[in-house]
Structure formats: structure tokens, C-alpha cells
């Protein structure tokens, strides 16, 4: 039903494999009066789990420790809803690109893939938008994983907190297909990592580093922003009013790359990441190319 609020105050829950802790397709709620409030700490011991999957306004105050397994997603926003990580610490583990398992702390929206466009419209999944806001802390602790991901015209990602890249080949914010991202906070990395990327902005997406925004990376082959596109699409756009401090051997503040070079720039398969969840579905899918693996609830 609609307008049914979900308040989770259980101290701790554990997810094993292919599970979703809170799922709601109710689109109601506001920042002051959320449809979902989660105060529960969520731990994943396995893989391909979702902490919160929501269409309404959701506030997360719990800590999510999803670092043990691969392919875990902290929160996923659909149907133009908003998920706000108000006070929580969301930690994601690794990704296995070859096995289609991606760790993402916060994700929003879905846009048709090239494979979808080959199908009749009636057989395509529903495109959807979402909004994600981080006011807490995101730790990206596994290779090839992402802090914040937004896809689609109308989808937004806003970081007011801290995104920390704590493993090789990790990315702070990934914006694609006309999504818009704002950084008011900090994107940084742990000591000793390499090949980290602050922001990827792709296919007409836009990234605005606001006046208070800081992208500070000190790592071998660190990259502040990658602007890229698929064939026939437009490059991503960046507006910088804040601070970029990118240091380390082989580091670059900004790089422009055509799609054919994206694998080399980001690591295995990053250009093919999409989150495939039709609006209203009870299962979610993280898709790499043509290979799909679905959580079950």
C-alpha cells in the first residue's frame, strides 16, 4: 500500500546472500517526514545483498558493513524517490567484474542499455530515476567498487559527507546518462592504494564540484575526473568551483576518454556497469554486459 511508514529500530541485522533488508515501492515521504527511517545496523556476511531498496523518501541513520562479500549495494533509489544517508557509515566490499558482482554504497536510477534498445519497447524494463544524498561516511573497501552511482536524466547524487577510497581501482562518484552529481563534501583515499578515480562523468552527465567540495587524492595513477562517453553520446561535463588536489606518480586531475579507452582508464569492465532494476520489481539486478545476477527475496 501507500503511505505506510517503515521505521526500523532493531539494533542489528545480518544478511547472508541475495537478500534485501528493506524494500518499498511506496513513493511517499519527505525529508521532514520520511516514508522509511532506518536506525538498524546492517551487516552482510555474503554477497549480492541490498540494505535498502526504496521508491519513497528514506533516511538512513544505521551503519552498513557490507565489506565481507562482493556485489553488495547499500541503498538503491527508484521512482524519483530520495534516499538520504543522514548519519550512517556505509562500507562496501569488493567487486568481481568477470562474475558480475559490484559493490556500490549508494545507487540511483536506471537507463536503457544497448541490449534493451534492441528489444521492442514493450519488452524493455521501465526506465526510472532516483536521488541519493550522503551526509555521513562512505567507505569503498574493495577493488572495482563505487561510492555513489546515478544514472538517467533526473537522477541526482549529492555528497555532503566523506567518500573514502580504500582499495585499488575504486571510484568515488559514477554519473552517467545525464544524471547530475554535486560534491559539497570530500572525496579522498587511504594511503597505499593506486588507480583510484574521484569521479566518472559519462554520456551527458554533469558533475559540479561546489565551493565547499574537495577532491583530494594522493595515489599512484590517481585520476580526479574522467569525462567519457559511449559511441553516439556526448561527453560528460564538469563544473568546478571547489578544490581538486590530485597527487602521486602518474596522477592526472582530468582525463577525456572515448569509450574504447575506458577499460584501460578504469580497470576491467567499468564502462559496462549498469544497475538493472525495473521500477516496482521485487528483485534487483546488477548487470555487466549481457550477464545478469539477481538478488532474491
Where are these regions (language model features)?
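Long, low-complexity, polar and repeat-rich extracellular regions
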Residues: 1-297
Amino acid at each position: 500500500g501507500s503511505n505506510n511508514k517503515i521505521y526500523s529500530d532493531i539494533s542489528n541485522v545480518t544478511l547472508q546472500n541475495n537478500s534485501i533488508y528493506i524494500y518499498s515501492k511506496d513513493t511517499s515521504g519527505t525529508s521532514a517526514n520520511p516514508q522509511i527511517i532506518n536506525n538498524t545496523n546492517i551487516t552482510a556476511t555474503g554477497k549480492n545483498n541490498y540494505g535498502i531498496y526504496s521508491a519513497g523518501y528514506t533516511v538512513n541513520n544505521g551503519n552498513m558493513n557490507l565489506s565481507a562479500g562482493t556485489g553488495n549495494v547499500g541503498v538503491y533509489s527508484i521512482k524519483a524517490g530520495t534516499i538520504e544517508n543522514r548519519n550512517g557509515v556505509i562500507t562496501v566490499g569488493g567487486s568481481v567484474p568477470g562474475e558480475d558482482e559490484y559493490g556500490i554504497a549508494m545507487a540511483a536510477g536506471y537507463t536503457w542499455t544497448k541490449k534493451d534498445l534492441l528489444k521492442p519497447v514493450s519488452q524493455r524494463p521501465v526506465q526510472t530515476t532516483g536521488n541519493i544524498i550522503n551526509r555521513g561516511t562512505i567507505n569503498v573497501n574493495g577493488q572495482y567498487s563505487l561510492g555513489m552511482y546515478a544514472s538517467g536524466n533526473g537522477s541526482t547524487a549529492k555528497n555532503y559527507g566523506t567518500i573514502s577510497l580504500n582499495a585499488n581501482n575504486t571510484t568515488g562518484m559514477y554519473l552517467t546518462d545525464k544524471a547530475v552529481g554535486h560534491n559539497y563534501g570530500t572525496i579522498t583515499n587511504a594511503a597505499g592504494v593506486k588507480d583510484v578515480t574521484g569521479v566518472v562523468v559519462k554520456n551527458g552527465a554533469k558533475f559540479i564540484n561546489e565551493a565547499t567540495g574537495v577532491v583530494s587524492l594522493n595515489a599512484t595513477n590517481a585520476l580526479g575526473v574522467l569525462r567519457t562517453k559511449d559511441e553516439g553520446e556526448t561527453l560528460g561535463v564538469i563544473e568546478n568551483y571547489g578544490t581538486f588536489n590530485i597527487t602521486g606518480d602518474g596522477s592526472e586531475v582530468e582525463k577525456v576518454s572515448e569509450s574504447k579507452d575506458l577499460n584501460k582508464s578504469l580497470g576491467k569492465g567499468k564502462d559496462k556497469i549498469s544497475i538493472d532494476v525495473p521500477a516496482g520489481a521485487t528483485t534487483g539486478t546488477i548487470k555487466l554486459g549481457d550477464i545478469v545476477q539477481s538478488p532474491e527475496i
